[in-house]
Amino acid sequence: MSTPRTTAARSRQVVGAAAAGNVLEWFDFALYGFFAVTIGQLFFPSTSPTASLLAALAVFGVAFIMRPLGGVVLGRLADRTGRRPALTLSVLLMGVSTTLIACLPSHATIGVAAPLLLVALRCVQGFSAGGEYAGATTYLLENAPSHRRGLWSSIISATSAIGVLLAGVVALGATAWLTEEQVTAWGWRLPFLLAAPLAVVGLYIRYRLDDTPVFQELEARDEVPQEPLRSLGRSGIGRIGLGFYYLATYVVTHLTTVVGLGRTEALLLTIAGLAIYSLVCPLAGMSGDRWGRRPTILLGGLGLAVVAIPSFLLIGSGTPALILIGLTAFAMFEALANVMLGLLLVELFPARTRVSGSAIGFNLAQAAVGGPGPLVAATLAAGLGLAVAPAFYVVAVALLATIALARYLPETRGTDLITGTRSPAAAPATGDLTTVEETR
């Protein structure tokens, strides 16, 4: 059974709701990375600026530890009660926690309680983000035409980047309009306060949604699981052990602390790189629809391993044009990998446990690889004294992920999102006609 064709009006509503909510979610989550240097000074004071920065980036990574738990709780909610309630809750949690970060007193005011409260709120952000990616991707793709799922999947990757991009624009505005002293004293709080009205908008948009045709079909068949997590052992979760994480929020820190650019110039270049990434995402999605998910994600992973070191060499040159070339090369292959990753997470799991399984699989990889990314990158750059050092981590992750995917990943193009079977007519040129259900 194919996903029912939606009307043009409903398609616009579905895409708009998923995109808007995802932008708001990642805007809130990314602000921390853009203000990591300032937050490090205020909440982790030290005689060494590097030590303060590393402490702030460590807290950035702490949020990723909570993402698997958020995936479990919000994924279970989405599989039991519907995709919409979980998506609405994720926006609420992110908005409240981000707003509260804006209100936190610094270490100079309340001492050690300040970093402890910051860690707690970052954990809530991580919990929320743990359910957002898989939930939004599932909601979008369960509404998408089967032959356009790759293109629709690119909306999630692109809007994630747009959310980060908008956070960068706001950070740029604060840098341009305020002095460094004003940013440190109170200006950094203003972007975080934007989370409150944005959360209200996100809640309104998502509350008005209907649930997906796939979940409605499960309800009609009385196949909605009461305990979806119990069946995950058969769902193929172990086949997604590693993922890719775009170090967008680290780039601006790298450009200012390692390369030596001014903050305004670093933010402009980072914003440009994110814009390029978001523009490439639809092309990556169409590639997956045309040639298959497996070859596209393998090309992305292998490409990242190849271009990471040259890209960081260009980034480390300090020349804006060369930096932009390096970011563009990195963004192109990152888009191929990330767009297909979201699509595969939906198509690999059965409808009854789709959000739980994909959220846990994705977030375990993020907690192990993505969360420590900025901290590892900054530590390598500081320890080795090389601007190219963060690329070593990217190469290692990309190679390991590509090898694992090449070994275990089936082709999923043409998968029916209810039955889990794949039409032989949709098979790619490899001739692999294995159904997804058989690979579980």
Regions inferred by a protein language model and the residue ranges of each:
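Hydrophobic core of transmembrane alpha-helices in multi-pass small-molecule transporters
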Residues: 110-130, 321-336
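Extracytoplasmic gate region of multi-pass secondary transporters
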Residues: 33, 234-277, 370-374
